[in-house]
Structure formats: C-alpha cells, structure tokens
C-alpha cells in the first residue's frame, strides 16, 4: 500500500520481479529478512503501530508539536493477534535471553525487535554490507504519550555484537540521561 508522507522514500516490495516467484526457500528466507521483501522505515513503523494499537495501523506523521494520530488501516490484525505479538516483542527486551535485552530501561515497558539485513547480490557475495535495525514502541509510557521508534544504520557488518546493537545504544539514550 502506498503511504502519503511529506518525505520521499523507496517503495516497499514483496519481490524483485513483477510477478512473485515464491519457492519454499524464498518464502523461508523472506521470513527472517533475507529474501526479496524490502520494507522502508516509514512502512515498518506503520506495521509495528498495529501491534501497539490492537491491530490497527496508524498513519505515519512527523510530529512538529501536538501531532494528530489517524488510523491508516483498521483491523489489519485481530486485537488478540496484535496483543500476542506485542507481548512477545516485550519479551525480546525484558527477557535476559532476549536479543534486545540491552534496551531494557527500569520503569519503562518497551516492545522491540532486532534485525540485521544482508545486502548480498548472490550467495557468494562477501563484499556487500548489512543493515542493522531496531524497531520498538513503548507500552503505557508517560501519561499515554507512547512512542514508536524505528532505527536503521547501514554498514554494520564489522560490529561484532550484531548491527542492531549499535542502533539500540542510540535509541536507549533517549530514555536514559
């Protein structure tokens, strides 16, 4: 779906070709972010907003001050499914074994997901970089002023702790002074 937004960004896609050719391998690869699916950060924010809002996607906006929240698409997930995903995403941060446990902030409930996307042109490509992602949102934060934050940084292939952990440090600094 096209999202009207005051900034220009690349369109999200399901496939590198006009007609998706979904082999079992390509479907599995896409499930963990290594297939043809490409999602821009604005679209990713809208998807995550559905987990925070009982299944409804919020229309993205830039908040200069007192932004107005509008629903982009109602009930893209059932409230039950959205809450299950939200609780799982909270465990990614809260559980000591979670991939984003470094994001845990005392007194703040944060739901999040780490990710690293490879930019390889082929299975033998060793020169292309990676993208480190961290997508998160607060739950019942600061008098109902919840935040959804999408962070992505390029060329994280030399980060020994994974690309998303660089992003986590930056986002956590918004909560810890």
What positions do the PLM features span?
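Beta-lactam-recognizing serine transpeptidase/beta-lactamase-like catalytic domain environment
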Residues: 1-153
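Glycine-rich loops and low-complexity Gly/Arg-rich segments
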Residues: 56-57, 160-161, 173-177
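Short, gly/Ser/Thr-rich active-site loops of penicillin-recognizing serine hydrolases
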Residues: 68-73, 165-177
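Membrane-interface anchoring segments and C-terminal beta-barrel signals
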Residues: 134-139, 157, 170-176
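A short acidic/glycine-rich loop-to-helix N-cap element
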Residues: 153-169
């Amino acid at each position: 779906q096209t999202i009207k937004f005051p900034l220009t960004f690349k369109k999200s896609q399901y496939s590198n070709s006009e007609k998706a050719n979904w082999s079992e391998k390509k479907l599995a690869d896409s499930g963990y972010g290594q297939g043809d699916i490409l999602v821009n950060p604005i679209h990713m924010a809208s998807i995550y907003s559905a987990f925070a809002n009982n299944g409804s996607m919020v229309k993205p906006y830039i908040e200069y001050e007192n932004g107005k929240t509008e629903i982009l698409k109602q009930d893209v997930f059932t409230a039950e499914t959205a809450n299950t995903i939200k609780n799982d995403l909270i465990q990614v941060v809260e559980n000591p074994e979670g991939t984003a446990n470094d994001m845990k902030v005392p007194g703040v409930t944060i739901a999040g997901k780490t990710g690293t996307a490879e930019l390889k042109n082929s299975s033998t490509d060793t020169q292309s970089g990676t993208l480190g992602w961290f997508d998160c949102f607060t739950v019942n934060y600061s008098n109902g002023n919840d935040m959804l934050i999408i962070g992505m940084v390029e060329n994280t292939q030399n980060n020994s702790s994974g690309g998303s952990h660089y992003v986590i440090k930056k986002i956590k600094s918004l909560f810890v002074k």
